[in-house]
Each structure stands twice: as C-alpha cells, then as structure tokens.
C-alpha cells in the first residue's frame, strides 16, 4: 500500500481494524461491494440534486452512472448520495429561499462522510451555486458536472425559448394579440427533453461561469442534456476527480480571484443573468475571496456581449453548443481573460480555448460586431440604493438606460397583482414602476418578481418595456429595463421603503446612478417615521433565514455560514 493511499481521508472510515472500521465497511458491503474496494483507493462522492420535482435535473441519475464508470476506470470507488434539490419552476415562495439550506446540506454531507473528493451534479438555477457554496466551505477536490440545457423548444415551425417566450406570450395574451388556446398549445413544445432552460437563463449562466472559472471540464456549459457527449463528459469527469485526489488539487486552489474575474467576464460575454452577481458573491464569501459588487463594474462593465442567445439575442443554447460552445466564446475574448488561471484539469484555463473554433458567426459574434458593446451587468448606486443595485444592459431598451420619471409604487407583490390590470391605473410609459417588500427578508428569499408585468392599459397600446425598480431578482430568461437587488432592501429599512407614488426617480445606467429626487430633509423625515413590518416568521428555517440573511450586495448568504470549516475528520460515531 502506497503512502498516498495511507494519507487519504477515507482511511479514517474504512482503513482500520477497530470496531468503527468494521461497522463502516460491513454496512457498505450490504450493497454488494467486495472487500477489495476498501483497499485504500480514493472514495469519490457524487453529490446529486436529482429529483422528479426538479425537472431540470431529472436525468442526473443517468449522468451519475457516467461519472461512476470514470471513477471505477481510474481506480477509485464511487458513492452517490442525495442532497436537497431546488426546482426553480416548482418551489414556492422561491427556490432562492432554500439555496443556503442546500449549501448547508452539501457542506455537512461532504464533511460527515468518508470521501476524498466530490463531483457536484447540479443544473437548475440555485443548485449549482448552493452546491459550490457548501463544497467551498469543506474544500476537498471538487468538479462540477452540469445537467445541460433542454433541446430547443419548437412550436409552429419555429424555435421558442424557455422563460423568455413565456414572458412574451403572456404579454401577447394580455394585449389580445394571442389567443389563450395558442398560449396553451405552445406549452408542450417549449420543454421537449430533460435539462435546464435552453435560453441564457441563470442555470446556463452559472454553468458558463463554472466552465470559465475552470471548475468543470471544457464544453460543460452548453452541450444539451440528452447529447451523448454529456454522458462522455461525465465519464471523463469521473476519471479526472480520482487524479485530483492523488494530486491534492482542492477547490481552494481553483477558486482564485483571477478565476472569479474570468467568471465575471464570461458572464458579460454570454449575456448572462443578473442572478450570477448574488451567487458569485456568496461563493466568494465561502472561499474567502475578496469579491465585491464594484468588481462586476470594474471587470465586466465594458465587456461586449457576443453570444446571440435569448433573452438578449435570438438563438438558443443548443445553437451555442453547435457553434463552438463556451471554449469558442472564450477564444474570442481571450485578450480579456486571465490565461494562466488554474483549472480542475490541472492546466491553465487558456488550454480550454486553445483549439476552439467558432462555427457560426451569428451565434457567437465577432468582436467587431457584438450583440451589444459594454454589455456587462452594471452596478448602480445613489440615494435610492446606497449599497448598490444591478441592471442588465444587454436585455434592456437602450433608450431607457438613462431615464427620469414619476414613481408608481406597489407595496407588495399582492398589491401589484391586484392593480396591474386596472384600466384606470394612473401610469404612462414614462412612469417608473417600484415594487417593495421582495428582498431577502421581505418576500422572503428575494423572489424572481422584479420583471413586473407592463400595466395592461399600456400593453394594449403597444408598450413592451418601461423602467422597473425593486429589491427582488428576476429570472435570467427575462428581459427589460429592470433595476434589481436594491440594497438595503425595503424590509431592512433601505430608502426603497420610503418611496412614494409621484416621487421622481432618475436612472442613469451608463453613469451607474440611481437617485430619488427628493430633498434630504424630506428623506430624513420619512425615514424617521418608518416602521419595520411585523415579523411573520416565528419558528423553523424561515425564522432562521429572516434573522440571519445578508443583503444582496453581500450575496444573501446566512451570516454564520460565511467562510469555511474545512474537511477535518470528525469524532467516531460509535
């Protein structure tokens, strides 16, 4: 037996001749594992977020088999285990409420079991960041395998995109331009296979960031969920994680500031989701990396969007895969990236794009013909968002990026839904819609309701965008001139709480400014009179979340989870 094998963490579980070693091995053998798999080889955990209630991840047990084949081939011992699964399209009030709970689940499962390395199988929006947050707090060798996008949606002979076309079709029904029967008929054609949204929503955004940060093998981001090459990728990931254990290539060696900056740049280039901001901040907090909101402006603000995929463009992720995938995107923007940043492959990230080619210049645009110049997520500050807010220029209307208008305020999401279709709602296309009470504490969980519907009376006149401001998030598949993540949120006593209908607001996304045009004296008087809303949650996880969640500009993690505790071998259990 080599010294390497003696040093493996798993030997504290399976290597002894004492009572506890007997217990650990004996009960594992009831699954049919033979003696020799406990000979000191690396034990690889496959952390699986499979669930039938998470349609995006419904095929992950199949991909897990691919990972296992690779682990066995490389001389390891794979063990699959479940963790919480967050179905974005199914959970209420919002999957984001449970991202931190998933992170706790992942962290404690990895630490508590006798494993030497871990493969994270995720996909649906919050599963990838939740798994990475948990894994970063333990710091074993770690690789991500994403579930991959669904096949392109098809309806009436054309491609339709998940999420993005839902919002468009819904507004068309409200405007009387689409029948309810047509709306329902499009439903089955939109989701034709397992996988995540095939638009550049949060799931593929996070998969793209993961690949750009060197946390997965190349091509992980865009290969369709049902493409045989994703199964092969899973197999190769299984082989590689065993090698990483022998190399002691831990997650902390990959989660560098340079790789976070590469992730920010990639997010801008693909027209990625605003949700990436809050997730990357949370992962950085676990990894001990000094990442702040201003870094997204500094690093990504001037990066062009060159991926012509919905919601910013017209194609879908299956098209991106066939056009060359993320390696081809990185090849085009390589002058902006840190080429020597480390990867799970043990090579510099530049090797990921070295041989990549672009096969469709309309899907992956040349730098001299971008979809949108200076398209990175912009950070806004001002007296309405002292700690920051974000906007996605690539999905906004250019003429609204600098806009001043009167506010119309909705105090809650219920208030909005009760009034938005009122034919007498006193708004014009210059009005700025403001929604309160939808931040981390307020909703709770900072739901994806920031892309408020356009008032029906304006939709019927052909208006399809207007400035909207909230402390909420929005789906990565959504679009519009939408200011999000206003911090501090209304329920935490941020200035958003004291905005009144009729107040004038000025947005200047190019200058990074968001201001309430009310005198300092009036603002101070309103704030002095403000009372926090009554606390609704008196027990359980909701109370824990409300009492300890950080604001959006800090990643909305729970305050006591920031940082790491490591992979210490814990006390024996018997």
From Swiss-Prot:
E.C. code: 4.2.1.-
Cofactor note: Binds 1 [4Fe-4S] cluster.
GO biological process, one term: carboxylic acid metabolic process
Keyword field: Iron, Iron-sulfur, Lyase, Metal-binding
Disruption of the gene: reported phenotype: Cells lacking this gene exhibit no detectable phenotype when grown on galactose as sole carbon source.
Cofactors: [4Fe-4S] cluster
Pfam family of the protein (one): ILV_EDD_C
InterPro entries linked: Dihydro-acid_dehy_C, DiOHA_6PGluconate_deHydtase_CS, ILV_EDD_C, ILV_EDD_N, IlvD/EDD_N, Sugar_Degrad_Dehydratases
Record-listed [4Fe-4S] cluster binding positions: 124, 197
A GO MF label: metal ion binding
PANTHER family named among the record's database cross-references: HYPOTHETICAL DIHYDROXY-ACID DEHYDRATASE (EUROFUNG)-RELATED, HYPOTHETICAL DIHYDROXYACID DEHYDRATASE (EUROFUNG)-RELATED
Function: Involved in the degradation of galactose via the DeLey-Doudoroff pathway.
Family the UniProt entry places it in: Belongs to the IlvD/Edd family.
Name listed for the protein in its UniProt record: Putative dehydratase IlvD1
Organism of derivation: Rhizobium meliloti (strain 1021)
